């Protein structure tokens, strides 16, 4: 009976449990040799993709790009090894052309059961071969004008997306707790490394740059400022379907951080920026218009303009900006994602990473539009928030997951009915006009021109789609 020492047995098994990761790695090495098709065989397919990417200067993003960026700074902190299957995620202005060409090259090289088709997320595509568990390539469509604006660095002929841009993709995952966290431990580690080696060092330089320089204050009329404040007090406050981001959210966090001379870091809000669930988007826009029509503090003859914009990449969805007499008042962003928030004074404010993601997105959009003034303002805000967060955590002796204004990895998010990417994929497949792209070379080799026929990419340029102008309370309506 002495052998059945329950405590001792449990301690022994705990020691085994600590070795599980190493045992799994050993099993994976054996699997790569024994399971068909073998790792050695399939690695040849990624060589074909790699050569294609180099030849056509496609832009690699994701884990591989982050790993190479980290390698430049610290080889010991890289997370991929030679035993990992190459993970080629790349942006393309012509994904259909690339998929057909790569698929045909794989067939020519002797690979069987090659398939290229649309993935779960809109504007994303994947290539597989021989029923192998890993994708050969994952391709994301980016409109050509924006594509050539994405910053990169080059190693061995491959264009990798730069950390400044890559951090937005990582923050997108950190702010999607319901459907984006299945590999959260990896993504958080990647965010940490990018911040350590790139974001924080740059923040230090920016803080020096703006230390003695006060940004030009935005000009605004008193009645416009009062109107914004009234919208926040009368409509935004206590509204469970709205999350504030942008200027007002930035000012809230800066105030709560209590950093030295924090009042000097506050900015004059350009407009109210908020995010609302997609099913309430149109109704909310109508309610804002009705409210502004009744504005008693505005000038007698009001010109209210609603400018609608397409989604911008995967960074934010469709939006509408409402202005009065040429002055911005509010911009409303739609979302289908359950986004995390915190509540201050009965107003939902985006979490730290959600606000940072929004500011990075707007900064990139400003750089594309060559709006250098706004680009500098967003740069200034990002640096201040980064500094405010770290100073707050250090002063309060927090690690970051506690309930504070700068809390990370918050699970609570806006929305009650959440649908997965697979749900939206099924809806797209059921659509009449576009059932999704699919190409199977074994059914007959096709050219890119044949496969692109009648296929249209969704518009995610972030460009203006139309204006609706209401003059003097419905006196005239003009649509452009």
Where do the language-model regions lie?
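Residue-level detection of beta-strand-connecting loop/turn positions
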Residues: 1-8, 131-133, 157, 326-327
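Helical scaffold of the NTase/Pol beta-like nucleotidyltransferase catalytic core
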Residues: 1-68, 178-252, 464, 471-480
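Amphipathic alpha-helical segments
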Residues: 95-109, 278-295
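Conserved catalytic core of two-metal-ion nucleotidyltransferases
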Residues: 104-148, 291-340
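C-terminal, non-catalytic extensions of nucleic-acid polymerases
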Residues: 2-17, 21, 30-31, 203, ...
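Phosphate-handling catalytic interfaces
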Residues: 149-178, 182, 338-365
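Active-site nucleotide-donor binding segment shared across nucleotidyl transfer reactions
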Residues: 42-96, 100, 227-282
């Amino acid at each position: 009976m002495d052998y059945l020492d329950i405590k001792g047995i449990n301690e022994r098994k705990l020691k085994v449990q600590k070795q599980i990761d190493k045992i799994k790695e050993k099993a994976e090495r054996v699997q790569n040799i024994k399971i068909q098709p073998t790792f050695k065989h399939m690695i040849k397919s990624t060589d074909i993709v790699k050569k294609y990417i180099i030849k056509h200067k496609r832009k690699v993003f994701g884990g591989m790009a982050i790993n190479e960026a980290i390698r430049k700074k610290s080889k010991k902190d890289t997370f991929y090894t030679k035993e990992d299957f190459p993970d080629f995620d790349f942006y393309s202005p012509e994904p259909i052309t690339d998929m057909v060409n790569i698929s045909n090259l794989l067939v020519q090289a002797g690979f069987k059961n090659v398939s290229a088709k649309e993935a779960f997320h809109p504007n994303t595509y994947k290539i597989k071969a021989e029923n192998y568990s890993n994708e050969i390539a994952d391709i994301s469509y980016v409109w050509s004008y924006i594509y050539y604006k994405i910053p990169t660095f080059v190693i061995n002929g491959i264009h990798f997306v730069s950390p400044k841009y890559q951090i937005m993709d990582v923050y997108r995952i950190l702010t999607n707790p319901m459907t984006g966290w299945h590999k959260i431990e990896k993504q958080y580690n990647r965010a940490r490394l990018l911040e350590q080696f790139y974001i924080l060092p740059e923040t230090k330089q920016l803080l020096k740059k703006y230390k003695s320089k006060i940004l030009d204050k935005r000009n605004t009329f008193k009645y416009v400022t009062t109107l914004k404040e009234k919208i926040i007090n009368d409509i935004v406050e206590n509204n469970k379907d709205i999350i504030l981001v942008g200027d007002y959210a930035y000012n809230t966090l800066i105030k709560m951080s209590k950093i030295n001379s924090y009042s000097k870091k506050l900015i004059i809000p350009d407009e109210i920026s908020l995010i609302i669930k997609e099913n309430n988007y149109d109704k909310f826009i109508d309610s804002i218009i009705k409210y502004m029509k009744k504005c008693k503090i505005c000038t007698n003859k009001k010109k209210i303009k609603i400018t609608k914009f397409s989604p911008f990449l995967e960074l934010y969805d469709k939006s509408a900006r409402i202005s009065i007499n040429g002055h911005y008042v509010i911009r409303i962003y739609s979302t289908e994602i359950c986004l995390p928030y915190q509540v201050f004074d009965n107003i939902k404010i985006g979490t730290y990473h959600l606000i940072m993601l929004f500011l990075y997105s707007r900064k990139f959009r400003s750089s594309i539009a060559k709006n250098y003034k706004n680009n500098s303002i967003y740069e200034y805000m990002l640096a201040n928030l980064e500094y405010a967060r770290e100073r707050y955590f250090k002063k309060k002796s927090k690690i970051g997951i506690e309930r504070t204004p700068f809390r990370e990895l918050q699970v609570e998010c806006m929305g009650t009915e959440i649908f997965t990417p697979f749900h939206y994929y099924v809806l797209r497949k059921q659509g009449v006009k576009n059932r999704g792209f699919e190409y199977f070379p074994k059914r007959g080799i096709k050219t890119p021109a044949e496969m692109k026929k009648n296929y249209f990419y969704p518009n995610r340029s972030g460009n203006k789609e139309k204006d609706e102008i209401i003059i003097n309370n419905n006196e005239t309506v003009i649509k452009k």
